């Protein structure tokens, strides 16, 4: 099949979160399965065409009478970078710097039209146009309204993926004329949302199929508690909504080959994991104790990630015989709470405020447990990294965490520990269960091996998307 994939960020060229990872990995996995995949994204000012060996295309796109030039990557799934100096090239950020850019509606309406102009200019004939998050939400409507007679897009079906429903691209209704949209889109059945224009809602209303990044998150967003104001629409489209779990880069995240680790290991030989633990304790200034459970946390210090639960429980956590290590940045009050705990209990706590890719790998390898108490989690990556590295996750049973971690039954089943209530005591109970299980080395090793045997590759995800694409393209 021929697939056009449109995203506002694509790793490794541009990334602010999980969307960039998906847009960088899924098209390649689909191409490896024999599909012809092209990706469209902006050429932001942070992307140096020469450093990335991008090739200029001497064919201009006509976007509402304005010529647009392109760059293309040298990939099996080529990435086409849309050039626009004012909207993209002159900006240091993707969506904003201290605050969102005031013209984000115009910027991403431009991306939507450029993406739809590209097939005709390059001789592509996509069967599927796959959109991602609010930045591409106008594409399904524009395909129907402005490209209904476009031979290059004849019969193309649209898939719209929600990576995080909390980010919706909501703008003043006064931008409608500036975007070249007709006023009939500004109604409840289309893009109107509390007297504003909602780009994400546009995608949900007009796309042929909807997906999100885990089966449980697909169910959660169709409830009043998880729907962020769009649950009724998602229930209305329940037959078209599919939860497909993200994958991870199993080459980058492989303890047998990981270049960031002081010692490598595998399910066949776990001895290197103990060496990684000792090295991590030394690196972070903790007492070097092979017997003590080492608990890691990595990620944004934000309310979504449940770090307020950890702060509330820090006293009880650090009263136990364990070591807690944290890597991340975010809300200043959370940063200070972890810094203060590390100062007060340097034998039990280490906090690194910031981000360090190598240290993230070493923490996944050196820890015994990974704590992820998210308030909500569309998919989550770190629990999958942890399972692959033989590090047992302790998670709140939401979104992708529910789908990827099986609760330990106390004997022979399970890959981690789960709790449901969003409360410090519920989290502490799960941690206590994990610490008790850690004392049984035989059962613990068996749990590690069960997790390490799971398949979280992008090929598994690509197969699920492939099945959805085929169902849409079938006559």
From Swiss-Prot:
The keyword Transferase applies. Keywords: Glycogen biosynthesis, Glycosyltransferase, Transferase. GO terms for biological process: glycogen biosynthetic process. ADP-alpha-D-glucose binds at residue 15. It is an enzyme of class 2 (transferase). Pathway: Glycan biosynthesis; glycogen biosynthesis. GO terms for molecular function: alpha-1,4-glucan glucosyltransferase (ADP-glucose donor) activity; alpha-1,4-glucan glucosyltransferase (UDP-glucose donor) activity. CDD domains: GT5_Glycogen_synthase_DULL1-like. It catalyses: [(1->4)-alpha-D-glucosyl](n) + ADP-alpha-D-glucose = [(1->4)-alpha-D-glucosyl](n+1) + ADP + H(+). GO terms for cellular component: cytosol. Disulfide bonds: none annotated. Its EC number is 2.4.1.21. It holds the Pfam family Glyco_transf_5. InterPro entries: Glyco_trans_1, GS/SS, Starch_synth_cat_dom. Belongs to the glycosyltransferase 1 family. Bacterial/plant glycogen synthase subfamily. Synthesizes alpha-1,4-glucan chains using ADP-glucose. This is Glycogen synthase. It comes from Anaeromyxobacter sp. (strain Fw109-5).
């Amino acid at each position: 099949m021929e697939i056009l994939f449109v995203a506002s960020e694509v790793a490794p060229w541009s990334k602010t979160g999980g969307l960039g990872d998906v847009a960088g990995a899924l098209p390649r996995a689909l191409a490896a399965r024999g599909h012809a995949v092209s990706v469209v994204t902006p050429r932001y000012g942070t992307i140096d065409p020469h450093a990335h060996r991008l090739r200029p295309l001497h064919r201009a796109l006509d976007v509402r009478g304005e010529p647009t030039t392109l760059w293309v990557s040298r990939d099996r799934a080529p990435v086409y970078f849309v050039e626009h100096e004012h909207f993209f090239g002159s900006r240091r950020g993707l969506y904003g710097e201290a605050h969102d850019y005031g013209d984000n509606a115009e910027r991403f309406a431009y991306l939507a039209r450029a993406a739809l102009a590209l097939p005709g200019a390059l001789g592509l004939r996509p069967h599927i146009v796959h959109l991602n998050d609010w930045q591409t939400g106008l594409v399904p409507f524009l395909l129907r309204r402005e490209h209904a007679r476009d031979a290059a897009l004849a019969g193309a079906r649209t898939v719209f993926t929600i990576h995080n429903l909390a980010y919706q691209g909501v703008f003043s209704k006064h931008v409608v004329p500036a975007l070249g949209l007709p006023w009939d889109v500004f109604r409840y059945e289309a893009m109107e949302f509390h007297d504003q224009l909602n780009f994400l809602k546009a995608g949900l209303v007009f796309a042929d199929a909807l997906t999100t990044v885990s089966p449980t998150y697909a169910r959660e967003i169709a409830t009043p508690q998880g729907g962020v104001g769009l649950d009724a629409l998602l229930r209305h489209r329940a037959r078209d909504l599919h939860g497909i779990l993200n994958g991870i880069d199993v080459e980058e995240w492989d303890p047998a080959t990981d270049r960031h680790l002081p010692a490598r290991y595998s399910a066949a030989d776990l001895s290197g994991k103990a060496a990684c633990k000792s090295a991590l304790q030394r690196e972070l200034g903790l007492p070097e104790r092979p017997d003590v459970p080492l608990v890691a946390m990595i990620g944004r210090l934000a309310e979504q990630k449940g770090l307020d639960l950890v702060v509330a429980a820090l006293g009880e956590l650090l009263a136990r015989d364990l070591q807690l290590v944290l890597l991340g940045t975010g809300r200043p009050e959370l940063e200070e709470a972890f810094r203060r705990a590390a100062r007060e209990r340097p034998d039990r706590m280490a906090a690194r405020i910031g981000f360090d890719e190598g240290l993230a790998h070493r923490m996944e390898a050196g820890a015994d447990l990974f704590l992820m108490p998210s308030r909500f989690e569309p998919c989550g990556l770190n629990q999958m990294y942890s399972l692959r590295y033989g590090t047992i996750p302790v998670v709140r049973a939401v979104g992708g965490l529910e789908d990827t971690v099986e609760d330990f039954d106390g004997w022979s089943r399970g890959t981690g520990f789960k709790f449901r209530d969003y409360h410090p005591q519920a989290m502490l109970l799960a941690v206590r269960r994990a610490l008790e299980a850690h004392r049984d080395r035989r059962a613990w090793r068996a749990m590690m091996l069960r997790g390490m045997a799971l398949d979280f590759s992008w090929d598994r995800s690509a197969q699920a998307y492939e099945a959805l694409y085929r169902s849409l393209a079938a006559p």
